[in-house]
Structures are given as structure tokens and as C-alpha cells.
């Protein structure tokens, strides 16, 4: 059962402002330097502020307390949930465990587990329940439009290099989780598990505004690679397709340059041809 109110949560010792630390490996100074010549200064300012202070998820409406039941899949795969929570807490991206709710407006959504293509399972937070009163219901999708790169975009780039163009791919790992959320919105991303309470502090999958918000950072990386480092690429969210001339080391050099830039900015990557 999902989205059932379990009663008004009772706060215990509250989370202090001093505990509201932003968690992201992304290096503000590197982005500031690399984006210094970007023409859209307001956008750059927003991006840098997001790295320093976290991004707003765009929720409109009151932050009211609510507790939702976890999905059946969570009880069917408890080790998955426990392991994922422990990993995220250790990484500093999830706060907890708390014996009592950490904020008066704490709102928990249902935890669940879903299978991945590699046969493993992954933890999810069901932010679209309860219907009509969920976190996602409070985020207007028209405020967060996203336009993905298409196959035609990739074909156009490849065609510029002609027959025999060399392709490679660089993936940003745990990409959404690199983007921190502003502390004012942490109470919207609550979880409860085995009698304890947790709060997410980084972009989760399933949040309505997450693809748009993450893509702003991916677009920044794309601009940096193309403008400052002469890397020819097209990206679809966290996947970057890099193209080089046939019979030359351009593609390999571009991959290495991409990995160097990502390392300086502190993106986690996996690259392969």
C-alpha cells in the first residue's frame, strides 16, 4: 500500500542549521573558471549557486508533514534497501538514521526496489504517491522542460567527419547524485525504514524536476568541452558520444581530454570506445 498517511509525525531533536552541509564532489572553482566566458551570466550564476548552496527542486505549496507506507517490493528485498541506505549515508548524500523525524515538516515517500538491466536491484523513492498530494504533484512540469539530443543530432555530428569516423562514449556515473539539493527542500525527500528516518540531500531518480536540473550541469560540461577544449561531442543526459576523424588519434585525444576535465571538476566517469 502506497501513500497512506500513518498519522502526524512527532518531531524529536530537530536538525540544526549547522548540520545542513551541502554534499557534492563538484568543484565550484573549476566550474567558475571554465564558465568565465560563457555568454549567459545569469545561468552561470544559477549553476554556481547550485553547486555552493544546492538547487531548488521547484516544489510549490506548503511543506506539510506526511508519512507514506513503503512499497511491497521494499519488504520483499529488505537487504537491498538497507544496503543502499547505508551506502548513501556513508557517502554523505542521505542524512540519518534519525530515531525521530528531523524536521517538523518531514515528508516521507514510499521506498521500493526495482530490477536493473544487469540483474541487480536498485532502491527507488516513489515521489508520485499519494496521487494528487505527492511531491511530484507539487512540481509543475512545464517549469522544467527538457529537450534531449536525438539520433539525428548524433548523425549530424558523425557526418561532419565522414566515412570511418571514430566514436567513443564517456558516461557520467551516479550523475544525478552529484547535484546537491538546497536544504530548504530536504524535508520533501524523507524516507522511513525499520523504525528510523532519513532525508535525501541530492537529486533522486523519480523526482519530476531532476532530469531538467541535472541537464543544466551536463550542458555546462558540454559547453566547456566544446568551447574550451575543442571536443566534438553530443550528449544525452549523462552519456557523452565523442567523435573524431578517421585514421587519426583525435577521438582518443578527445576522450582523454574529456576525462581530464571531468576529473578536475570531480565528475565520476567510465569511458570506453
Enumerate the language-model features and the residues they cover:
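Short amphipathic alpha-helices and their capping/turn residues within compact interaction modules
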Residues: 90-93, 116, 223-226, 230, ...
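Reverse-transcribing Pol proteins
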Residues: 1-142, 235-237
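Catalytic-core region of right-hand nucleic acid polymerases
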Residues: 72, 80-215, 261-264
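Histidine/cysteine- and/or acidic
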Residues: 153, 255-273
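Short amphipathic helix-turn segment from helical bundle oligomerization domains
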Residues: 66, 202, 242-245
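Short, flexible/disordered secondary-structure transition segments
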Residues: 96, 228-232, 251, 268-273
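Short, conserved secondary-structure transition motifs
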Residues: 159, 163-165, 177, 243-246, ...
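Active-site palm subdomain of RNA-directed nucleic acid polymerases
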Residues: 211-259
Amino acid at each position: 500500500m502506497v501513500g497512506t498517511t500513518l498519522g502526524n509525525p512527532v518531531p524529536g531533536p530537530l536538525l540544526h542549521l549547522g548540520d545542513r552541509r551541502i554534499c557534492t564532489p563538484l568543484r565550484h572553482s573549476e566550474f567558475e573558471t571554465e564558465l568565465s566566458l560563457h555568454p549567459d551570466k545569469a545561468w552561470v550564476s544559477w549553476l554556481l549557486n547550485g553547486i555552493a548552496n544546492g538547487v531548488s527542486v521547484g516544489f510549490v505549496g506548503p511543506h506539510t508533514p506526511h508519512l507514506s507506507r513503503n512499497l511491497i517490493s521494499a519488504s520483499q528485498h529488505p537487504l537491498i534497501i538497507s544496503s543502499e541506505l547505508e551506502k548513501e549515508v556513508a557517502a554523505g548524500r542521505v542524512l540519518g538514521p534519525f530515531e525521530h523525524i528531523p524536521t517538523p515538516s518531514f515528508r516521507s515517500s514510499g521506498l521500493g526496489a526495482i530490477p536493473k538491466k544487469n540483474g541487480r536491484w536498485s532502491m527507488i523513492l516513489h515521489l508520485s504517491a499519494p496521487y494528487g498530494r505527492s511531491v511530484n504533484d507539487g512540481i509543475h512540469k512545464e517549469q522544467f522542460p527538457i529537450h534531449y539530443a536525438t539520433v539525428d543530432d548524433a548523425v549530424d555530428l558523425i557526418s561532419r567527419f565522414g566515412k570511418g569516423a571514430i566514436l567513443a562514449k564517456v558516461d557520467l556515473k551516479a550523475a544525478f547524485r552529484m547535484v546537491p539539493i538546497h536544504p530548504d527542500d530536504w524535508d520533501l525527500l524523507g524516507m522511513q525504514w525499520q523504525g528510523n528516518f532519513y532525508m535525501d540531500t541530492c537529486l533522486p531518480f523519480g523526482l519530476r524536476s531532476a532530469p531538467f536540473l541535472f541537464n543544466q550541469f551536463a550542458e555546462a560540461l558540454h559547453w566547456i568541452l566544446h568551447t574550451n577544449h575543442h571536443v566534438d561531442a553530443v550528449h544525452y543526459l549523462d552519456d557523452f558520444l565523442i567523435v573524431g576523424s578517421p585514421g587519426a588519434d583525435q577521438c582518443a585525444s578527445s576522450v582523454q581530454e574529456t576525462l581530464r576535465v571531468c576529473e578536475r571538476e570531480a565528475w565520476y566517469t567510465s569511458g570506453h570506445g
